Amino acid sequence: MNNINTTLIEGRKSHSKFHISLKNVDKNYGDKKILDDVNLSIKKGEFVTLLGPSGSGKTTILRLIGGFEWTTRGEILFDGLDIKDLSPHKRETSTIFQDYALFQHLSVTGNIKYGLKLKRYPKDPSSIDPGIYKNLEKKKKEWEKFAKSKMKQLDKTQEEYEKILKSKNLSRGKRQKYQSWLDDSDFKYSYWETYVVNKVEQFEKHHLTRKITKDEINEEITKMIKLVGLEGSENKKISELSGGMKQRVALARSLVIEPEILLLDEPLSALDAKIRTKMQRLLIELQKKIGITFIFVTHDQDEALELSDRIAVIRDGKIEQFDTPKQIYDYPINKWVANFIGEANFFDVRFVEKNKALLLGKHIPTIHTEFEEGQKLDGLIRPEDIDISLEKGHFEGVVEKIIYKGSYYFISVNVEGKIIEVETNDYFEVGKKVWITWDLDALHLMAKDHKGFMANDF
């Protein structure tokens, strides 16, 4: 049986190809800009991770989507409809916070049951008076007419205020008043744009749905307990559970209300390594099984690479790159992203001609053709893409340090004063002369990142 929220949301949907879109979103706290012109579009059923260091703005984006914060400017669209004026409980989202926010006085079952109190199911069509639908169509026309009149009134007021602001004789107080109204006009328009849809939802909820029964509640709880692996813990108190089990309860409580979008704010950060790995696998399994959109916040690069369909890498309130894990890891847009997303060797490079780059004094073949001759670039080669041997290669160097990592060795090679890191299965003694080389496509060239960064950014 379908959740009524899923049924009602159909009335909101347009033909947008994206489930969620943020368009030109700014967020300010006083004079401090937290988000700067953020544009992000997420498809239905995607697992998207917002990845960035502390203070980058990733959690703010999540809170804007969930309705816990308001944008300063810009649009937040669900299926093409601007919903930034909607309160959290009216959005098709459920949120798992970093501390899980579980009810300590309730059992596992009690926590999962909590969200079901407001859940409603569609009534049996045969029990509904056909006149209800005629009445709904009549009211829709009335609501549409009313909303249009309000929109026209807003247009007129906006035009009037914009004209007034052009006057040079306007006092400072009045100028601020009119400008403040214009700055907030986005929210005023958004309210009336969604007015009809909201009225229809209220009508349908009252006339076309019913409360969920006790048996249905128990059925939903049993299904969810099985889904997240909580069998045998139904009656336990929250204080009796491990971190991993608490996380499962939080997942069950969020998923039982059948949201279209699950928002996860660093939910695994407090778990130890083994439990964290198990929960990562569970998240992937659940997302594929139920098929809803997951938006996951983390500062852990490995976690983002393992979980995501796509990753938005965020820096100082801006999205630096939004792409698949493979594209971001292999083809980062700049040095900052490359350094943040994994181990890397960087080189100062000059593009000398088509398919050639000057690196450490040598002309090295490259697959790149898009840069201008003489252009200064950043070069990237991942440690695992470098071959080390005793046979002649691109550069000769000396092994300075070797670290055993279990399944491989991490070796530091000194090449004319430049330390190059290499991952290899072969052992080389410290002080040994070696040669390093790499495949043609291992060298990735990027335009210089003039913004720069400090080591403590990571």
From Swiss-Prot:
EC number(s) given by UniProt: 7.6.2.11
Subcellular location, principal: membrane
Membrane topology designation: Peripheral membrane protein
GO molecular function: ABC-type polyamine transporter activity; ATP binding; ATP hydrolysis activity
Keyword line: ATP-binding, Cell membrane, Membrane, Nucleotide-binding, Translocase, Transport
Domain of life (superkingdom): Bacteria
Compartments where found: Cell membrane
Pfam family, one: TOBE_2
GO-annotated cellular components: ATP-binding cassette (ABC) transporter complex
Region of interest: Insert: 120-210
Positions contributing to ATP binding: G52, P53, S54, G55, S56, G57, K58, T59
Catalytic activity, as annotated: ATP + H2O + polyamine-[polyamine-binding protein]Side 1 = ADP + phosphate + polyamineSide 2 + [polyamine-binding protein]Side 1
Subunit annotation: The complex is composed of two ATP-binding proteins (PotA), two transmembrane proteins (PotB and PotC) and a solute-binding protein (PotD).
Family: Belongs to the ABC transporter superfamily. Spermidine/putrescine importer (TC 3.A.1.11.1) family.
Function description: Part of the ABC transporter complex PotABCD involved in spermidine/putrescine import. Responsible for energy coupling to the transport system.
Protein name per the record: Spermidine/putrescine import ATP-binding protein PotA
